[in-house]
A protein has these predicted regions:
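Conserved beta-alpha junction segments in alpha/beta enzyme cores
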Residues: 1-89, 93-135
């Protein structure tokens, strides 16, 4: 038997996450207060013959190992999904908020807004929980 559930949550920076740097633009040195597009995190959960799989897509430029590892371990603990069955990808947008703790362009300044990475983890957990709690 195959069971499938999906959920989408908003991850657009607001409130304490603005202003923020825009990701993937090394020549842009200023922060922005404006949001041109809404950003989302979409999760799909499969249960195929009692085997659980979680696939996530996040509207950010990229996800580093540390952030993905935190998300995967959280879902593993919450729902007993095998770590290797949790896949997280990104759309690689250059118009979203900065999410990396280490600057990809070799600059000294870390440009991610404090707390935004933790916000992403919570929103990923929320989307996964919505999938598991649907009837």
């Amino acid at each position: 038997m195959i069971l499938v559930s999906t959920s989408t949550v908003k991850i657009t920076p607001t409130g304490p996450y603005l202003p923020c740097f825009v990701s993937g633009n090394p020549l842009r040195s200023e922060k922005t207060n404006k949001v041109h597009d809404c950003f989302e995190c979409t999760v799909i959960v499969f249960k195929i013959n009692n085997k659980l799989m979680v696939w996530g897509e996040i509207d950010i430029i990229e996800i580093d190992f540390r952030l993905a590892d935190t998300m995967r371990k959280s879902v593993q603990k919450m729902y007993n999904v095998p770590y290797e069955n949790i896949i997280i990808g990104t759309i690689h947008t250059h118009t979203g908020p900065e999410t990396l703790e280490e600057n990809a362009f070799g600059m000294d300044e870390v440009k991610v807004v404090p707390g935004y990475r933790e916000f992403l983890v919570k929103k990923f957990e929320e989307a996964v929980s919505e999938c598991f709690n649907k009837e």
